[in-house]
């Protein structure tokens, strides 16, 4: 029995007219997400990054050579507002991790590209990040992992379909 079970017991005692079963799912997801995010933040902080900065650098890195995307593509991949992205890019550019260049495709727009320093940093940090994720998921038996992924994928898809 965990803390969430004890909370559910209290609700069942106090409000037997309510089916509080979903509270267990949401309570555990919230507690787990909070703990996982705290653990992942340690990797970012150890490398003088925020999760937001990591997301931008990782998005550029996984795009493949020349590790450059338009600002609108970055916004689409990271799902943030334009102003939010501008602030992130300004901070990363000030650190020399990215640079804004004229878009070679049309000569008018711009692209955001990893610098050599940014590429070296994200290659190191993403390796640490993945190792950390392996460490964090080790508490879940390997045979349960595909089932969790399947359930979460289906649940997330139901929200994304409604959002259009």
Describe each PLM feature range.
Residues 28, 55-59, 120:
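Pre-recognition alpha-helix immediately N-terminal to the DNA-recognition helix
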Residues 89-150:
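Charged, amphipathic alpha-helical coiled-coil/dimerization segments
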Residues 1-47:
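N-terminal leader segment of winged-helix/HTH proteins
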Residues 20, 37-81, 164:
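N-terminal helix-turn-helix DNA-binding core of bacterial DNA-binding proteins
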Residues 1-17, 143-164:
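C-terminal regulatory/oligomerization modules of transcriptional regulators
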Residues 18, 49-51, 114, 140:
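Alpha-helical hairpin
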